[in-house]
Amino acid sequence: MEDKNKTIKETLQGAADAGKRKKLIIKKKGDENSAPSSASPKKETIAESAPVKPLTPLPSRGDSGQSPIVRPAPSASKEVKYEESSRKQDSGQSGSRPLRDKDSQVRPSGDSSYPVSRSPFQKEDSNIIVSRPTQRPVRPNPGGSYQGNRGPGQGGGYQGNRGPGQGGGYQGNRGPGQGGGYQGNRGPGQQTGPGNRFGGSGPGNRSGGPGGRPMPITSAEVELSQARGSTGASKKKGHDKEKTSSDKRDFSGAENTKFFKQRFKKTKVVGVSGVSVPKEITVLENVQVGELAKKMNLKPGDVIGKLMKMGMMVTINNIIDAETAALLADEYGCKVKVVSLYEETIIEEEKDNEGDYINRPPVVTIMGHVDHGKTKLLDTIRRSSVIDTESGGITQHIGAYQVKTARGLITFLDTPGHEAFTSMRARGAKVTDIVILVVAADDGVMPQTLEAISHAKAAEVPIIVAINKIDLPTANPDKIMQELANHGLQSEEWGGQTMYVKISARENIGIDKLLEVILLQAEVMDLKANPKRRAKGTIIEAKLDPGRGSVATVLIQNGTLRVGDPFVAGVFSGRVRAMYNDLGQLIEEAGPAFPAQVTGIDGVPDAGAPFDAMADEKEARNISQHRIEFEKIGNAGAAAGTTSKVTLENMNEYIKLGALKELKVIIKADVRGSAEAIKESLEKLSTPEVKLNVIQSGAGAIVDMDVMLASASNALIIGFHVRANPKTIALAEKEQVQIKYYNIIYQVVDEIKLAMEGLLEPEKIEEVIGTAEIREIFKVSKIGNIAGCMVTSGKIQKSANVRVISDGVTKFDGKLKSLKRVKDDVNDVVSGFECGIQVDGYNDFKVGDTIEAYNVTVIKRKLE
C-alpha cells in the first residue's frame, strides 16, 4: 500500500515539475485580449475546443479486490508545448475533433506502444494536443466562485451539478466527448457554438467558417430550404462573412411563415367589397368611369389612377369609350364584352294574332287660332256626353278624355293648341288620328291657323274644318272656305277632299254632326288595335302630385293596361298602383284609345314619351337604367342609324339610305312678300327624283315653334333678313335643326339648287372605241385562256372597259387584265393588227366571239 501511494505521489510530483518547466496557461473564451489582473488569482480552465473525459476517482482496496489502474504521466524527457495558437490553428483550419484519452496515452518511458492518434482532418505540421493528466487534484475546500459549491469531481453554478464525466447547467447533460444545453448534442470533432446549424458560418458547425464543416442534411431541412427558395448548398471557406438579409432568415424557423402569408394576402387585388375582379364584364359603347369601377368591383380612385397612367385626365363622371375600358380591364385580367346601348333601350315588339284585332275609337286633336273657340268647343262636347249627377260632373283635367256618342266612342286630346301637338311629334309620338281645325266665321284665316295647317300636313293627318261662330250676324262661311282652299283645303262641296262642318260651340249648334263626321272619317281610316296584348301607348302629360307622387296621363294605343302591370315610361320604370279615368273614378284596366291616369312611376316622364307594359319588373328596371345611361351619354337622338336631322350637307346620305324622299323647308322672312317669292322660286326646283316641300312660310323672326316644327318634320329653316334669338338657337342645337341665313333671294335659290343637283344621279355616256374578233384560243397553265384576236375596227386600249359578245348576246362585261402584241405588253392595238387579250375574271372564250372596248363618260346633271 505504501508503495502504491508512493507511486501516486511520484506521478503527481512529476507532473508538477513538468508544469514548472513549461507552464500551461489556457484563457477563457472571450478573455484573449484582456490583460491579467494582479488582484485576482489566475485560474486554469478547460479549453472548449479540446474537451477531455474526466477520470473517475481511484477506488480503495476495500472497494474492490482488484488493483487500481495507474496511468503514468507523460515523460519528462519529451517536452510538450501547449499553446493557444495551436488550438486556434487546429480549430480554425483542420476542423479536428477533440482527442480522447485512449488516443493520447503515452508510456512513461516514451515508447510508442500507445501511439498518439491524429485527427483525420489535421495537418501534418500541427502540434499534437495530448490529454491532460488522468486525475484532477482534489481541492481541500470545494465550491466557490461562479461555478458554485461543488464536491470532489462535481461542478455547480451555471454549469449545474455534474456527475462523473457529465456537464450540467446551460450545457446540459453530455456523454463522453459531447456538449449539451443550448449548444445541443455534438458528436466527435464538432465545435461549440449556438447549436448545430447546417449551412451556417462562425462558431459552431457552419460550413465556410473557421473550424466548420457541413452537417448531414435532414429531410425537414431540405423541405424548408425549398420552401424558402434556398439551394441549401454550403459555401466555400472564407466567402460567407458578408451575408444578405434574405440569407440570414433562410433558416430562421417556420414561425415567420404565418406572418409572410398575411403580408401576401394584404397585397392581393380585391374590389371594394372584398370581391375579386370578375373575369368578364359587359359595357356599352361609352361608359362612365364610376360605372366601370362598379362593374369591376374596384375603387373609383384605382380606375382613375390607371387611366391617368394611360395619359387620360378623367374624373369619376367622365365618359370613356369601350376600347379604353377594354385596355384598362385587361390590366386586371378582365375581359370586356361591348353591347350596343341603343339596342339595349329597345323593347322587342310583341307578336300579334291578326284575329285578335278589333276596331278602336279615333283620337282627335283640336287646333286653331287663339280666339276662335277651341276651348269652348271642347267644353261643349264634353258636357254633352257627361251626366251632371255622375261624380259631380267634370271635376278634373287630365289632358285627354273620351265621349260617348250614338255611334261609338271618341277620344279627344285636350292640349294647348298645336304647340303640344308638335312637341309630341318631335319626340317621335304619333298619337293623333284626326285634326279638327277651328276657324271663326267672322274673323277668317289667321297666322296661327296657317301654322296649324302646316303642322297637320307635316304629320300627314286628315283635317276636318269646323267653321265656328256661325250664329253671329257677321259670319261669312263662304269666305272662310275660299281662303282655306287657297291653302290646299278644298271643300267636298267644291270638288275637294276636305270635310267642312258649320257649328256654334256657344249655342251647341252642329256639335252632333261634327261627331258623326269624325266617326265617318274613322271608318274610312279603318283604325284597329289588339286588346289581348300588353299595353303600348304615349304619355300625354305628367306631373308630381303631393299626395300620390308621380302621376301621368297615358293614352293606350294598343293592348290593355291593368293594375299591377310593370311598365317603362320614357326613361323611368314602375308598376301600376292605381288607375283613374277622366272623371276621377278608379278603374281596373284601360283598353285601346283609352286615356287613363296612372300612379306608381319612379319619376316624371316627358310628354310624348313612349309607354310600354312589361312582363317582368326586373326587365323594366334594366331598360330604364339603359335609357338613363343613353340619355347621359347624349345619344338620345340616335335611332336606326340616323343620329341627326337633315341638312343641306347630308341630304345626299339621307337619299341613299332611303330615309329622305323630299326636302322639307320652313321659310321665315322680314315681310310676307319676300317669303312668298322665295317659296315660289324653291317649289320650281322640285323634280320627280327629289321633291322640295315648303311646309311653312311666313313673316317674322325665327321662334321656338319654328324649330319644333322643323324637328318634328325633319326640315331645315331658311331665314331671309331675320334671325333667331339666343334661346331659339340653343333649342335648335339641342334638336339638331339647321338654320340658314340669307340676304339675297337668288343666293337662297342657288344654294338649294346646288344641294339638290348633288342628289341627282349623274348621266353616263358610253362610247365604243374598238372591236376585235377572236380567231384562236391559247391555254396557258397557271394563267388561263388567252384570246388571239384581230382588231377589226378602232383600237383596243388596255385601260378601257370590255364586253364579250357571242351571237349578239353579251356574255361578260369587265376590264382587261393584259394586252400583248406578240410577247410584249402594250397599251393599245389599232385596227389591222393581231393581239393577245386576257380578260379579268373570264376564260370561256370561243372562236368567232367579239370583244368590244368602250369608255364611259360621267356628266353631272343640272336642274333646269
Swiss-Prot record:
It comes from Leptospira borgpetersenii serovar Hardjo-bovis (strain L550). The gene is infB. This is Translation initiation factor IF-2. It is found in: Cytoplasm. GO terms for cellular component: cytosol. Residues 359-528 form the tr-type G domain. The keyword Protein biosynthesis applies. Residues 106-120 have a biased composition (Polar residues). GTP binds at residues 368-375, 414-418, 468-471. Residues 368-375 are annotated as: G1. Residues 150-212 have a biased composition (Gly residues). Residues 414-417 are annotated as: G3.
